[in-house]
Amino acid sequence: MRSMKLSALLMGGIILFWGCGPKILLPPRVDLRPYGTLGMIELSSNAQGNLAPYTSQKILHSIQDAQPGTLVMELGTLQNALGSVGRSELDYEAIKAHGSKYGVGGIIMGNLEIDKVKPSINIASTLATINVSAYVEAFLSAKLVETKSGATVWSNGAQGRENVASVSLMGGEPVFNATDPDKAYGQLVQHLVGYLCNDFRSYYK
C-alpha cells in the first residue's frame, strides 16, 4: 500500500513538473510580412449604421498590434473598391487590378452578419423606429486573398452573442448608430475580433 502511494506521489510530481515547465513562444500561424503592403476592404454587413466600419477598424488595429509595422492601405467599402478599378464584382481580375494599382500583396475582406435581434424591452407595434437595448447574435468572417494568384491564403470566423445598446429597428432591420461605439457594442466586437485575429499573434505552447 505504501509503495502504491509513493508511486502515485512520484507520478503526480512528474506531471506537475512538466506542466510547470517553460513554455515556448511560437511565431504567428499567419505571417503577413511576405505580402508587403496589405489592402483592406471595409466589412460588408446586413446591419446598417456604424457597426461594420467600427469593426473593420478594430480588425485593422488588431492586425497592426499583433504584427507591428504591417502596412495597410484602406480601400473603403466594397463598392468604392470596385469602382476604383472599374470592376462590377470582386473576382480574380478585380483582385489582380488592386494589386497592380496600389501595390498591395494581399487584400483582407470579410462580412459581419447580425441575426436574432432580441430587444430587452417591449416595443410598441405602432412605432416605426425606436432605440433599444437588445441581445444580438453576430457572426464575423474574414479572409486574406493574395493579389498575384487570387488564392485565399487565410480565412477565419467568430461568433458571439451580447447585449448591446443604441440599436434601432427600422422595418425589422437592425441599425447601429451609437455615438460611443466602444461603450455600446465594444464588448461584442472585442470578442469577435480577438478570436478572428488570433492567427496573427505569437503564442505560447
Outline where the language-model segments fall.
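Sec-dependent bacterial lipoprotein signal peptides
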Residues: 1-20
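Structural motif
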Residues: 12-15, 30, 99
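C-terminal/domain-edge helix-coil "capping" segments
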Residues: 20-36, 101-102, 114-117, 132-205
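N-terminal segment of the mature soluble domain
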Residues: 37, 41-116, 145-147, 151-155, ...
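Short alpha-helix boundary/capping motifs
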Residues: 91-92, 127, 178
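Short, P/G- and charge-enriched loop/turn segments at secondary-structure junctions
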Residues: 95-97, 125-131
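Outer-membrane beta-barrel translocator domains and adjoining extracellular loop/strand segments
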Residues: 121-126, 169
